[in-house]
């Protein structure tokens, strides 16, 4: 394959992995450890 094709596939794969990990962190089991700054601060 051409180097440009391999590079495009590699960059696309990396972006998909980063997006999947971000969604897992935001909505999966690790989200229980995230704090909400609006709930922590009381007026």
Swiss-Prot record:
InterPro entries for this protein: PSII_PsbN
Protein's UniProt keywords contain tRNA-binding: no
Membrane spanning residue stretches: 7-27
Gene Ontology CC: plasma membrane-derived thylakoid membrane
Pfam families: PsbN
A biological process term (GO) from this entry: photosynthesis
Membrane topology type: Single-pass membrane protein
Subcellular location: Cellular thylakoid membrane
Alphabetized UniProt keyword annotations: Membrane, Thylakoid, Transmembrane, Transmembrane helix
Function: May play a role in photosystem I and II biogenesis.
Record NCBIfam families: PRK13183.1
Family, similarity comment: Belongs to the PsbN family.
Name of the protein this chain belongs to: Protein PsbN
Organism encoding this protein: Crocosphaera subtropica (strain ATCC 51142 / BH68) (Cyanothece sp. (strain ATCC 51142))
